Each structure stands twice: as structure tokens, then as C-alpha cells.
């Protein structure tokens, strides 16, 4: 599907845009941020994230648990920002790669918790004890803030 869309865009003359260098520079700075901080224990943060998501945002969830999880996810973000990686060779740097992956996992965990809070029903692998009914199945649903 993506390939067909790209081909159609090219035929219409949409081509490609030049990258916004301010955005590129900001993302490089964000990616390199852990080198400016004293190395810390990201493994403990990862273990806490796994337990938190299972306990409060797992298959069986409720508003109280997901709200609690969102607060703790903010704490984990802060903890990760304070736990840098050793500054050295940046090629094949597994510590840096793990740190970046963990940051992404925390960000995606926040998205999952926010989206699950918006759903006031239970279906499939999403069961809310405070909304146990499945409710009507909409042909298409969009979750908006």
C-alpha cells in the first residue's frame, strides 16, 4: 500500500521535500543527550517499566491503575534522563542503543496508557474492570484527545 501511494505521489509531481534542518538538529541533540549525563542504571528502569505496564496497564486494567501508571511513567522518563551512558565510541554502542530503545518504550507506554484510558469498554486483550461491557462495535473508531 505504501509503495502504491508513493508511486501515485510521484506521478502527481509531489516528489520529496527537503528535510527541516532545525528538526534534524533538535533530534540529534535529543539522541545525544545521554552522553552529557553521568552514566546510570537503565536496567533498573527497564525492569520497573515492565512491572509497571504489566501491573497497571496489562490485560486487566482500570482508571486508577492507568492513572497511577502515567504518573510513574513520567517519573521513569525523568529517571532515564538522569541516567546517561558512557561517552565513547558511538558506533555500535549497545549502551546508547539500549538507552534510546528504553526512552522509546517509555514514550509508547504513555501512548498505550492514554489510549486505554479513553476506551470505556472491554474487548479482546483490553479489559477494564470499571467498564466490563464490550459496548457496540463501531465499524471505524478514532480516538481523539
In which residue ranges do the predicted regions lie?
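Glycine- and aromatic-enriched mobile tails/lids
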Residues: 1-145
Amino acid at each position: 500500500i505504501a509503495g502504491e501511494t508513493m508511486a501515485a505521489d510521484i506521478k502527481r509531481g509531489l516528489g520529496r521535500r527537503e528535510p527541516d534542518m532545525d528538526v534534524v538538529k533538535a533530534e540529534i541533540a535529543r539522541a545525544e543527550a545521554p552522553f552529557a549525563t553521568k552514566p546510570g542504571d537503565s536496567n533498573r528502569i527497564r525492569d520497573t517499566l515492565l512491572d509497571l505496564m504489566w501491573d497497571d496497564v496489562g490485560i486487566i486494567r482500570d482508571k486508577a491503575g492507568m492513572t497511577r501508571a502515567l504518573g510513574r511513567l513520567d517519573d521513569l522518563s525523568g529517571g532515564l534522563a538522569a541516567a546517561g551512558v558512557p561517552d565513547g565510541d558511538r558506533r555500535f554502542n549497545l549502551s546508547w542503543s539500549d538507552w534510546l530503545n528504553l526512552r522509546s518504550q517509555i514514550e509508547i507506554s504513555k501512548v498505550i496508557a492514554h489510549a486505554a484510558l479513553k476506551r470505556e469498554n472491554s474487548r479482546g486483550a483490553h479489559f477494564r474492570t470499571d467498564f466490563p461491557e464490550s459496548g457496540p462495535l463501531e465499524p471505524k473508531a478514532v480516538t481523539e484527545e
